[in-house]
Amino acid sequence: MRGKKVWISLLFALALIFTMAFGSTSSAQAAGKSNGEKKYIVGFKQTMSTMSAAKKKDVISEKGGKVQKQFKYVDAASATLNEKAVKELKKDPSVAYVEEDHVAHAYAQSVPYGVSQIKAPALHSQGYTGSNVKVAVIDSGIDSSHPDLKVAGGASMVPSETNPFQDNNSHGTHVAGTVAALNNSIGVLGVAPSASLYAVKVLGADGSGQYSWIINGIEWAIANNMDVINMSLGGPSGSAALKAAVDKAVASGVVVVAAAGNEGTSGSSSTVGYPGKYPSVIAVGAVDSSNQRASFSSVGPELDVMAPGVSIQSTLPGNKYGAYNGTSMASPHVAGAAALILSKHPNWTNTQVRSSLENTTTKLGDSFYYGKGLINVQAAAQ
């Protein structure tokens, strides 16, 4: 590869990017009792700071209220009151306010449809979430400051961008979230939320990188004992060196997954890109939420399996979230599924993991367009 510049491009098409608002604080009133009592917070005026806690409690009790808790640092108390007590307390000269004891909710965590579509929650409910499995996201880096991601390590092979934990493109961060966004009550949930993410930067801010950078990234993954490699990238040109790298990774026991490509159809010709085209790599095509092949998804005899890749919600740099389209979004579903399987069967070889994924798919149609079908990680992990 010396002296030969071969650039490889990202395999995703951005049809939609939007920031998601997850949940909101509710002002819903706690359900009232049959006698009309509801929960309130009664606050006292600053001029009453010398009044004893006992006397403040009496102020509420004398109006028919039932004090639940008197706060230590806030001059107020929670109480159960009926409408009459509320009116009388609002008139009391010692009372500053009487407000509803509103109900707040944890910010909602969304489970992207793709996670459910491949049956990952069934493994989660059994306690298998990817623990002790290392996944290398060979991509544009990962924004390690994102609250929905926990990045265990990484390296950069891009000479001009030496920080793997800074994603100047957004692609790698989005891919990482699909693999392993945390189960932390915010944002989104990844396929394998407890997997260990490693940011291996091989693509620059413009979404491209030389094959030599990718090969360096694969070698780093081998040397650092990664269990799974995800490459949501590809190019139209084959390379003996790139093939040797992925073959070596598989020979070393790594499950290697790559996007099939976003080249759609071209008559009866294969449009699957490299490295997905190599036999040692699991090439992943994209379907939508109805299991229909995405029009952009590459086709060919090298296509192995399908996974969700249309309007996939995931993490973005800057503590954001958004939806992307592409086989780049499908591939990390399979990488995450491999991590789930390995968390349940830590002694399985990469060959067993791949076979289990391919032999338990939901058949969707002609293998030229759909490979072996949609992965079902619940069945694959049996």
Curated annotation (Swiss-Prot):
Catalytic activity: Hydrolysis of proteins with broad specificity for peptide bonds, and a preference for a large uncharged residue in P1. Hydrolyzes peptide amides
Active site: D139, H171, S328
Cofactor(s) the record lists: Ca(2+)
SUPFAM superfamilies from the UniProt entry: Protease propeptides/inhibitors, Subtilisin-like
Principal subcellular localisation of the protein: secreted
Residues reported in the UniProt entry to bind Ca(2+) 1: Q109, D148, L182, N184, I186, V188
Example GO BP: sporulation resulting in formation of a cellular spore
Use case: Used as a detergent protease. Sold under the name Alcalase by Novozymes.
Domain Inhibitor I9, first and last residues per copy: 39-105
pH effect summary: Optimum pH is 9.0.
Regulation: Completely inhibited by phenylmethylsulfony fluoride (PMSF) and partially inhibited by benzamidine hydrochloride, leupeptin, and pepstatin A.
Family: Belongs to the peptidase S8 family.
Role of this protein: Subtilisin is an extracellular alkaline serine protease, it catalyzes the hydrolysis of proteins and peptide amides. Has a high substrate specificity to fibrin.
Identification of the protein by name: Subtilisin BPN'
